[in-house]
Amino acid sequence: MVDYELRGGQVDCVLRRCVVADGKVWQLQMTAPLAGSDLPEDRMTPRERELCRDDMNHDFLSGVFNRRYYETEFCTKLDEWTDRHRCAALALVSIDDAAALSARENDAVMGQLVCFVANQWKKHFDQPAERVVCRLSDTLFAIGCADRTRRELEEELKAIYAGMPKECVASVGLMRRVPFTQSIGVAGTREVRCKNWDALYDLCQKRLVAAQAAGGDRVYDGE
């Protein structure tokens, strides 16, 4: 994630990234000063500003929305939906055994796999005001959807996942097929007292972990 911060009259470009190594998640931050005391957006035309913000809201690898968009743009829509008495649902999607895959495959192959998975979901969730897919971390995605209960989104995701390829053709080096599966946890606003994405996320995460513990390759559909 790239951001800009004003510190003591100096504009800094801040790059933040999470790196998984040895089973731990490390948060890296790099800062570099920019010339002048104005934020880059202040120097742009309206069109340049729009393009810049759009670029900052998308994952550089897969092209789907990123965590920044999820946290600053899409999550705020929940308040609008609940104010209008509209329900919403959230799903967390994870590639199974990602650590083992990363250990077995090189970065280029993993990048192709992530892009493949992202684009499979993007086919069905690419309406920024209502249905979106976001890449939250290396192999974790969030799918947000308005006007769906938990069960309705579960059934939709089951149907989509059932027809989704479970092999990615890796074109790095010798062309070959890389098999993979996914686990999915879903929650809806009607299930949580605090109708916000944090509460939904926590419930989704519990169900995602349960799906993985049950062997993966499934949409969690327990109680």
Predicted segments — roles?
Residues 115-189, 208:
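GGDEF/GGEEF active-site signature
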Residues 42-49, 150-158, 172-175, 187-220:
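Catalytic-core segments of nucleotide cyclases and related cyclic-nucleotide turnover enzymes
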Residues 57, 66-89, 96-123, 134-138, ...:
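Conserved long alpha-helical elements within nucleotide-processing catalytic cores of c-di-GMP signaling
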Residues 15-22, 31-35, 147, 186-188:
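PAS-family sensory domains and close relatives that share small-molecule sensor folds
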Residues 22-60, 65-79, 129-131:
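Signal-transducing coiled-coil linker helices
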Residues 1-26:
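Per-ARNT-Sim (PAS) sensory domains and their PAS-associated C-terminal
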Residues 25-32, 90, 140, 185:
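Short hydrophobic beta-strand segments that form the core of ligand-binding sensory/regulatory domains
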Residues 89-93, 134, 185-187, 220:
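Conserved beta-strand cores of small sensory beta-sandwich domains that regulate signal transduction
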